[in-house]
Amino acid sequence: MDAKTAQSIFGGIVAAKKRPSKEVPEPTINFKSANDSLVKKNLLLKQQVVQCTKTIEKLRNENVALRQKNQELIDGTLEQRIELIVEQRLKFRLAHAAVLHKKLVQNIQQTGLELDGLFKDLEPEPSGLNTRRPPKLELNLERVDEIPFCQSSMQGEIDENEIRFDNNSSQSTSSIQNAVNGTPRKKQSVGKGRRSELFQSFNADSSIVEEASTIPTNRRAPMLIAPSSTPAGPSKPTARKPPTPRFKKPSTPALAPQSDDTELSSTIQVRRQRSAKMNIKSLKEPSGKDKLRRPGKHDEPMPYINTFF
């Protein structure tokens, strides 16, 4: 029996429908980027290996040097040990000082740069205006004849008066010198004479000066002394008061002696009472005309008793 006949007899076999399955996308690996990252890691590891080998060699060399120093310290004497220790410490100190010096130089350079920046900030900004002086313009003006210098009339008169006064004074001195003997007077150191001679010489000199000062002049000389006020009239006679005595007699009479004995009264001298004693207010008795004061708390002999309860 063929398949076709069987299919026609029994009917067609229904085929099961397959569900569409979700296809999982395969991961796309970028082999180039992965290889680059692995190559970089490999290079870093190689560099670390090289550094580690260098440090290992350095530590080995230091270990050998320390063993040698230790052996020298063990084998050497006390003085050699001290010298080695001092030398080692000096090396450490010098290395430390070199590091400090390098840091100090760096700090100085940095502060210098900062100060330069501050000074540049503080400097005034150049203004856009032109600070140069403008060129001087030459003025072609006509020449004018100037007026000659003239002094004021008042100043000229004062100068002439001063000159005239100087001439007059010189003439007066020359006339004084020639008036006595017709010859110039010489200054001589003369000793002190009597008062009468001094007064006579003074009067003669004053008369000669008055005669010499009466020389006629064309112009009035300047006034060297301020004009005094006008003289007042004759003063009226005033009646003189009688002179007052300097000391007054005391108003209180002297006390009489109290004892009857004449001998005692003659020997005892009683001082008279002062006049100022009567003016002392504390010695005066209170007058009965005024109202008396009410006694206080501390008055004696009867104390103050308050009767108002």
UniProtKB/Swiss-Prot annotation:
Tissue expression notes: Expressed in gonads.
Family matches, as InterPro entries: Shugoshin_N
Phenotype of the disrupted gene, per the record: Viable with 100% of viable progeny. Defects in the regulation of the synapsis checkpoint and DNA damage response in meiosis with an increased rate of synaptonemal complex disassembly in late pachytene meiotic nuclei and an increased number of rad-51 positive and hus-1 positive nuclei in meiotic prophase. Reduces the number of apoptotic nuclei in the syp-1 mutant background, which is indicative of inactivation of the synapsis checkpoint or the DNA damage response. RNAi-mediated knockdown results in chromosome segregation defects during meiosis and mitosis.
Stretches with biased composition (Low complexity): 167-178
Alphabetically ordered keywords of this record: Cell cycle, Cell division, Centromere, Chromosome, Chromosome partition, Coiled coil, Nucleus
The UniProt record lists the keyword Disulfide bond: no
GO CC, any one term: nucleus
Tree of life domain: Eukaryota
Location, primary (coarse class): nucleus
Ranges for region Disordered: 165-195, 210-309
Listed Pfam families: Shugoshin_N
Protein's cellular compartments: Nucleus; Chromosome, Centromere; Chromosome
Coiled coil stretches, renumbered: 42-77
Composition bias, Basic residues: 184-193
Single Gene Ontology BP annotation: chromosome segregation
The family this protein is said to belong to: Belongs to the shugoshin family.
Function: Component of cell cycle checkpoints, which ensures chromosome segregation during meiosis and mitosis. During meiotic prophase, it is involved in the regulation of the synapsis checkpoint, which monitors whether homologous chromosomes have synapsed, and the DNA damage response. Plays a central role in chromosome cohesion during cell division by preventing premature dissociation of cohesin complex after prophase, when most of cohesin complex dissociates from chromosomes arms.
Protein's name according to its UniProt entry: Shugoshin
Organism this protein belongs to: Caenorhabditis elegans
